[in-house]
A protein has these predicted regions:
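Conserved short beta-strand elements that form part of the metal-binding/catalytic scaffold
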Residues: 28-61, 105, 112-119
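Short secondary-structure junctions
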Residues: 26-32, 87-92
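N-terminal beta-strand motif that seeds the catalytic metal site of vicinal oxygen chelate
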Residues: 1-15, 45, 65-69, 119-129
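Amphipathic alpha-helical segments
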Residues: 13-28, 81
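Vicinal oxygen chelate
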Residues: 4-12, 40, 57-129, ...
């Protein structure tokens, strides 16, 4: 069975983006070059690539839609990402039980991501938490 190893995004402001994900989610910087920064949570890596990277040339590439983060406390983590420059997007997804389960945001580069509760991950996505 294959396992997800990394997610890559192309941005103009690599350092600003890396600092946002380090401060907001505790990702660790594991690699850096002039045109890429690698962050990791110890399982999956987030690679932040500058458009000048020779491996990223070409106008036909498709971008990333959004990232999803599993968090213990949606309210607490929402406050943290907003303090680091994220902007909340759209409405809130609620479970049938009425508890808040997911919020969507945009990071300082405009990249969308969501914060998901363990209950939503387990009940909707069937992810063991």
């Amino acid at each position: 069975m294959a396992k997800l190893r990394h997610i890559a995004m192309v941005v103009e402001e690599m350092e600003k983006t890396a600092q946002f994900y380090e401060k907001s989610f505790g990702l660790q910087r594991v690699r850096q070059t002039d045109t890429a920064i690698g962050l990791s949570d110890g399982v999956v890596s987030l690679v932040i690539i500058h458009p000048s990277n020779v491996n990223m040339k070409g106008d036909d590439r498709r971008g990333l839609h959004h990232l999803g983060f599993l968090v213990d406390d949606v309210d607490r983590e929402s406050a943290k990402v907003e303090a680091n420059g994220a902007v909340r997007q759209g409405g809130i997804i609620n479970s049938e039980r009425g508890t808040e389960t997911e919020r969507k945001f945009r990071d300082p580069n405009g990249q969308m991501f969501d914060l998901t509760s363990p209950e939503y991950a387990r009940d909707f996505w069937r992810i063991a938490v």
